[in-house]
């Protein structure tokens, strides 16, 4: 629950947030982040591949800069396919601005408190596409109630999402952050992050 995580951290209910949290300037104002452990691409998902074609296994990540002109060709192709559709996104994520800026004028955007709630609406046909981490879908779409959901369209990564995902700490917990930084650096250096990502997500998420 995004609404409760940061207040819970600040209140001392837990000492670190570990939930694929994208590092952003806004979040860095109130949180202390570890070095990025991953830079995860995002993608659309559908149950009807007539809306968007099923993602090709092993397809390269399309890099988005966050500049509307530079990203225009990729976004325009998606706009054409998603025109008139309803897209579901989870509230409070780094993807909200991209979806609103790129598609709000040609599609309906429905915001959900949680990703599982959104996924069930996608399966039920109440929305026609969703947008989230590639790793989220890889981990969740093996479940029986969401087995009909498939990744669709290109994997989108690059500077648009910021430096990547990190673990979040209270501002005063610099010593704990340093310990995590050391462990993350070792996992990158020996290839552990890439090995695990390739095994479980079929995508290299090394920052």
What are these regions (language model features)?
Residues 1-76, 148-159:
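Acidic, polar ligand-binding/catalytic clefts
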Residues 1-7, 72-75, 109-124:
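Short helix-initiation/N-cap motifs at beta->coil->alpha
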Residues 2-3, 14, 21-23, 36-38, ...:
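Solvent-exposed coil/turn segments that connect beta secondary-structure elements
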Residues 4, 20-29, 97-103, 116, ...:
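A ligand-binding cleft/hinge motif common to bilobed small-molecule-binding domains
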Residues 29, 40-42, 83, 127, ...:
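Envelope-exposed proteins and targeting segments
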Residues 39-43, 135, 142-182, 203-207:
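Periplasmic-binding protein-like
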Residues 44-106, 110-113, 134-135:
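Bilobed "Venus flytrap"/periplasmic-binding protein-like clamshell domains
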Residues 47-69, 73, 160-203:
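Extended ligand-binding regions for polar small-molecule ligands
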């Amino acid at each position: 629950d995004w609404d409760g995580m940061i207040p819970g951290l600040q209140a001392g209910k837990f000492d670190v947030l570990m939930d694929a949290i994208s590092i952003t300037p806004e979040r860095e104002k109130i949180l202390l982040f570890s070095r990025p452990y991953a830079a995860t691409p995002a993608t659309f998902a559908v149950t009807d591949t007539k809306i968007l074609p099923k993602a090709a296994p092993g397809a390269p990540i399309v890099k988005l800069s966050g500049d509307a002109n530079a990203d225009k060709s990729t976004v325009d192709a998606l706009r054409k396919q998603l025109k008139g559709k309803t897209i579901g996104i989870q509230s409070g994520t780094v993807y909200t601005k991209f979806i609103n800026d790129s598609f709000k004028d040609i599609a309906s955007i429905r915001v959900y408190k949680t990703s599982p709630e959104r996924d069930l609406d996608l399966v039920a046909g109440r929305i026609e596409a969703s947008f989230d981490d590639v790793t989220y879908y890889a981990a969740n779409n093996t479940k029986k109630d969401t087995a009909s959901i498939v990744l669709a369209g290109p994997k989108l990564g690059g500077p648009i999402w910021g430096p990547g995902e990190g673990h979040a700490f209270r501002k005063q917990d610099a010593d704990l952050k340093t310990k995590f930084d050391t462990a993350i650096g070792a996992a990158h250096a020996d290839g552990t992050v890439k090995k695990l990502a390739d095994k479980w997500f079929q995508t290299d998420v090394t920052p």
